[in-house]
UniProtKB/Swiss-Prot annotation:
Principal cellular location given in the protein's record: cytoplasm
UniProt family annotation: Belongs to the RecA family.
Listed Gene3D superfamilies: P-loop containing nucleotide triphosphate hydrolases
Keyword presence, ATP-binding: yes
Originating species: Corynebacterium diphtheriae (strain ATCC 700971 / NCTC 13129 / Biotype gravis)
Positions that bind ATP: 77-84
Alphabetical list of SMART domains matching this protein: AAA (SM00382)
Record's protein name: Protein RecA
GO annotation, biological process: DNA recombination; DNA repair; SOS response
GO MF term list: ATP binding; ATP hydrolysis activity; ATP-dependent DNA damage sensor activity; damaged DNA binding; single-stranded DNA binding
């Protein structure tokens, strides 16, 4: 009986390992193009850029000064909690920076007048109101692959109805169709979003699981794929009604970053959404300014660098709204103090100084003179 041949691949040793790796890398580069495989240290990657949310508190909670470019973001919460308002403010900021924005209105509920009040350039905004979920996601994918879009908002995942469900009868069962649709779409879009630097914000609704005895029964629609593919997930909740006398003028809202792949998660932002006006940037500047010692508060008076801003938060808010240069200056100091956005490099420098071995040397008296 002939001896059986050993089919195990011979492991190269010493310098042969490097030669074998170089040959494999050369073949991969030839077949798939330059950059298909690279050493992580070979390329100097810039910090992750972001699109501002338009609100100081949210930008601080996100950790990088806004929603990350080239990534998927999920914004979910109960009805009328401010999800679409958050997304529209991000669109307005992208447009102010010279970017192009798109809005996939699967709910057919976009209010152009309200969007305009939030600062959105509705004349330049690309809007699609698709008939089916497949059509919505295909349009979104084509826009992303064009490489010309800075931000795209899909409102909402729950409204992305599969074609089979629309064409079927009302009582037909279509278990798992939407989850499979989302899973396939996200597999296709993730790479295209990264390559184009487009931020995709998926707005999602909440549902309750039946029979849950322990833990939260709340869950989001569209299956689990979005939870995995999203780099940032934000839970938006209305926590208080703001009143002027007996009249409701807005909501106090809490945004919790429940997942964050680009910065430490679980940070919380609280901000005011004023009816007909949107998120109040000035209120967040006042709150964060006081918290970080940039604005001094004495009783009901607010002071900045020795100058009185006004008495009462509402009057100071209106004053900052009338003087945007001052609001920008205070916001910039907040970002600097918290090492957010362009000031993130300062934190690395501070950490390097803190970790300096010289600082760790105990205080020792090296004086050789006798005490006698």
């Amino acid at each position: 009986m002939a001896p059986r041949k050993n089919s195990k691949t011979q492991q190269p040793t010493g310098d042969n390992r490097k030669k074998a790796l170089d040959a494999a890398l050369a073949m991969i580069e030839k077949d798939f193009g330059k950059g298909a495989v690279m050493r992580l240290g070979d390329e100097n990657r810039p910090p992750i850029s972001a699109i501002s949310s338009g609100n100081t508190a949210i930008d601080v909670a996100l950790g990088i000064g806004g929603f990350p470019r080239g990534r998927i973001v999920e914004v979910y919460g109960p009805e009328s909690s401010g999800k679409t308002t958050v997304a529209l403010h991000a669109i307005a900021q992208a447009q102010k920076a010279g970017g192009i924005a798109a809005f996939i209105d699967a709910e057919h509920a976009l209010d152009p007048d309200y969007a305009r009040k939030l600062g959105v350039d509705t004349d330049a905004l690309l809007v699609s109101q698709p008939d089916t979920g497949e059509q919505a996601l295909e349009i979104a994918d084509m826009l992303v692959r064009s490489g010309a879009i800075d931000i795209i908002v899909i409102d909402s995942v729950a409204a992305l109805t599969p074609k089979a469900e629309i064409e079927g009868e009302m009582g037909d069962s279509h278990v798992g169709l939407q989850a499979r649709l989302m899973s396939q779409a996200l597999r296709k879009m993730t790479g295209a979003l990264y390559n184009s630097g487009t931020t995709a914000i998926f707005i999602n609704q909440l549902r309750e699981k039946i029979g849950v005895m322990f833990g939260s029964p709340e869950t989001t629609t569209g299956g689990k794929a979005l939870k995995f593919y999203a780099s940032v997930r934000c839970d938006v909740r209305r926590i208080q009604t703001l009143k002027d006398g007996q009249d409701a003028i807005g909501n106090r809202t809490r945004l919790k970053v429940v997942k964050n792949k680009v910065s430490p998660p679980f940070k919380i932002a609280e901000f005011d959404i004023m009816y007909g006006e949107g998120i109040s940037r000035e209120s967040s500047i006042i709150d964060l300014g006081v918290d970080n010692g940039i604005i001094k508060k004495s009783g009901s008076w607010f002071t900045y660098e020795g100058d009185q801003l006004g008495q009462g938060k509402e009057k100071v808010r209106l004053y900052l709204k009338e003087t945007p240069e001052l609001a920008d200056e205070i916001e910039d100091k907040i970002f600097r103090a918290l090492h957010i956005g362009k000031y993130a490099a300062l934190k690395d420098a501070d950490d390097a100084l803190t970790d300096d071995p010289v600082d760790m040397v105990p205080n020792v008296d090296f004086d050789d003179s006798d005490d006698d």
